[in-house]
């Protein structure tokens, strides 16, 4: 295995060409490759899964990008994961199939992985490595940004306080999402999480009042969609949905499909978030980032960890998966002095519907709540099958209430939660003792349970309910109970909203959207 030195012009005076090139190269390396020439290595000593081990390399740096040239002339890129003496371990993003240890050459670039970003990326489709796959031209970059992002000063972050209206009642009333929040959808195989995400994309916007002075126009709204390991059907579903609704011009898609290299999935969400950060903090757009499927990402992480022979953690996943997931999820929010925001909705499929699996478990620690998609509700033909009991939005308290939605919002949400939880208990009791043994109060809770699932949770995929309509629907269900049983709502709020006429009069000035 010979090491070739690229002998371009530029040797030092008074020395042979090769020696001058070698000295020039050494200076270039210590100056981060500002000048040429560079060394071309042909020292691949082993290939293990997605990893390539290089021997006899000099000045290799952690996270440095390496370009491989295969015997047939095709180019691939990789990233240095580990350097030990003269050896370097490189993960190849496009996969290692076809790499010949004797004939493959590689070149160290001296730079980290940067992606070209531009406002023109909206309306475009890229593969998992950021290359255009929509037959369009290469992106004319406004800037080249590090895909790992820049650290944000925690003191300069703004607390998310503007509620996003999704038009989906169980989310808007009971798990309100704030602009700048990170909230995942916990789903499982065969459940309609893609349809829910597409509906949120179609309908998401600020809660609008009839006589607003502020600009709520949708021109500054953008969607960045990253797919990891999804099948062609899912990718086509989202693409056609964006096109049919006329929003494709505000969407940037990164697609790593199931037949694409597994290792590419590690950089796909980072490319998407780097693009989102540029759109949010430089172009001042409000960006909604959808990442699906984070389970595929975690499995790609496990594959690299296994190839490096690291000590595995729970179920074979690496011990640093929590940290790695945090580097993705924490890139959401708002920054002082910037008009844009990044709201993240990662989608993950729980293996075997197990919420204690390491992927949903660690995701729930990092993110600000979760939306739980339930298989039992789906089997009963309820769409969206969102189970509100295990669902949670930790930033809901600051995004609702008088001045943002309506002053009864928090109380209605608490009472609906309480009644639904008691209704579930009564339903379980009924299965044991029978309906005849239930009290009149228990029967009221059963009636509430059925109507809540049928009328409140259930709605059409193109049905867009305002938060005020959803709150009115909640009051309509709560009127099943006498006032004395609504213990979670203050008496003043009950007096104002419990009677049908009072609720309608209060609602009249606010509902025109």
Curated annotation (Swiss-Prot):
Effect of residue 174 to R: In DRTA2; disruption of V-ATPase assembly resulting in loss of enzyme activity; impaired trafficking of V-ATPase to apical cell membrane; impaired renal proton secretion
Chain positions of motif PDZ-binding: 510-513
Subcellular localization(s) per the UniProt record: Apical cell membrane; Basolateral cell membrane
Record-level Gene Ontology MF annotations: ATP binding; protein-containing complex binding; proton transmembrane transporter activity; proton-transporting ATPase activity, rotational mechanism
Result of altering residue 81 to P: In DRTA2; disruption of V-ATPase assembly resulting in loss of enzyme activity; impaired trafficking of V-ATPase to apical cell membrane; impaired renal proton secretion
Gene Ontology CC terms, in alphabetical order: apical plasma membrane; basolateral plasma membrane; cytoplasm; cytosol; extracellular exosome; extrinsic component of synaptic vesicle membrane; lateral plasma membrane; microvillus
Domain of life the protein comes from: Eukaryota
GO terms classed as biological process: adult behavior; ATP metabolic process; calcium ion homeostasis; chloride ion homeostasis; inner ear morphogenesis; olfactory behavior; ossification; pH reduction
Effect seen on changing residue 364 to S: In DRTA2; disruption of V-ATPase assembly resulting in loss of enzyme activity; impaired trafficking of V-ATPase to apical cell membrane; impaired renal proton secretion
Annotated InterPro entries: ATP-synt_VA_C (IPR055190), ATPase_a/bsu_AS (IPR020003), ATPase_F1/V1/A1_a/bsu_N (IPR004100), ATPase_F1/V1/A1_a/bsu_nucl-bd (IPR000194), ATPase_V1-cplx_bsu (IPR005723), P-loop_NTPase (IPR027417), V-ATPase_su_B/beta (IPR022879)
Comment text on domains: The PDZ-binding motif mediates interactions with NHERF1 and SCL4A7.
Assembly notes: V-ATPase is a heteromultimeric enzyme made up of two complexes: the ATP-hydrolytic V1 complex and the proton translocation V0 complex. The V1 complex consists of three catalytic AB heterodimers that form a heterohexamer, three peripheral stalks each consisting of EG heterodimers, one central rotor including subunits D and F, and the regulatory subunits C and H. The proton translocation complex V0 consists of the proton transport subunit a, a ring of proteolipid subunits c9c'', rotary subunit d, subunits e and f, and the accessory subunits ATP6AP1/Ac45 and ATP6AP2/PRR.
Disease: Renal tubular acidosis, distal, 2, with progressive sensorineural hearing loss: An autosomal recessive disease characterized by the association of renal distal tubular acidosis with sensorineural hearing loss. Distal renal tubular acidosis is characterized by reduced ability to acidify urine, variable hyperchloremic hypokalemic metabolic acidosis, nephrocalcinosis, and nephrolithiasis. It is due to functional failure of alpha-intercalated cells of the cortical collecting duct of the distal nephron, where vectorial proton transport is required for urinary acidification.
Protein known as: V-type proton ATPase subunit B, kidney isoform
The organism of origin for this protein: Homo sapiens (Human)
